Regions:
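Conserved GNAT acetyl-CoA-binding A-motif
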Residues: 100-111, 122
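Short beta-strand "wing" residues that participate in macromolecule-binding interfaces
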Residues: 65, 130-131
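Residues forming the Rossmann-fold NAD(P)(H) cofactor-binding site
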Residues: 90
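Conserved G/P- and acidic residue-centered "switch" motifs that form tight phosphate/ATP-binding loops
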Residues: 57, 87, 116
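Acetyl-CoA-dependent GNAT
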Residues: 4-7, 11-84, 93-95, 99, ...
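Glycine-rich acetyl-CoA-binding "A-motif" of GNAT/NAT acetyltransferases
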Residues: 58-61, 118, 144
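Conserved active-site tyrosine of GNAT-family acetyltransferases
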Residues: 123, 128, 150
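C-terminal "cap" of GNAT-fold acetyltransferases
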Residues: 7, 113-116, 136-156
């Protein structure tokens, strides 16, 4: 990504209210059961760790995390469809990992649908391991889908 960074203006910045319209577009285009505008605004208002990835001023991704003591829970991470499989998800994760180690976070965990093969592939390449399952966690057209719980140590 560093060679891309020299050519393109890539920014990892704090999520602001003015980003919400673009985030909602990505969210609705990516998920059958998207988060609402209120959820995103509540995350910003209640000091969740909310970041966006801008590429030449275009919002291409975002991540929302909860930081509690020495743990980081990734609650939502998404890359705009046309920008997937180009390294932006990896870049976003790596920036998050670097940043949270400054807050003494040692463990990062998240939930992922087993059906989200591309996300699972990214997380596993980035050192996440499956540590559990949450039964019937995600709404799905046929009822509910389990969630895989993935975790990574970012600081020993």
């Amino acid at each position: 990504m560093s060679s891309l960074q020299k050519i393109l203006d890539i920014q990892y910045v704090k999520m602001e209210n003015e980003h919400i319209a673009d985030i909602l577009e990505i969210e609705r285009d990516s998920y059958g059961y998207p988060w609402s505008e209120k959820i995103f605004l509540d995350c910003i208002t209640h000091n969740y760790h909310c970041k966006v990835l801008l590429l030449d001023e275009i919002l291409v991704g975002y991540v929302i995390t909860s930081l509690v003591q020495n743990e980081c829970h990734i609650m939502n991470l998404c890359i705009k469809k046309n920008y997937r499989s180009h390294g932006y998800g990896k870049y976003l994760l790596n920036e998050l990992h670097k940043e949270i180690t400054n807050f003494n976070c040692k463990l990062v965990f998240l939930e992922c649908r087993p059906s989200n093969k591309s996300a699972l592939s990214l997380y596993k390449k980035e050192g996440y391991n499956e540590v559990g399952i949450r039964k019937n966690y995600y709404p799905a057209p046929s009822g509910y889908e389990d969630a895989l719980i993935l975790a990574k140590n970012v600081k020993e």
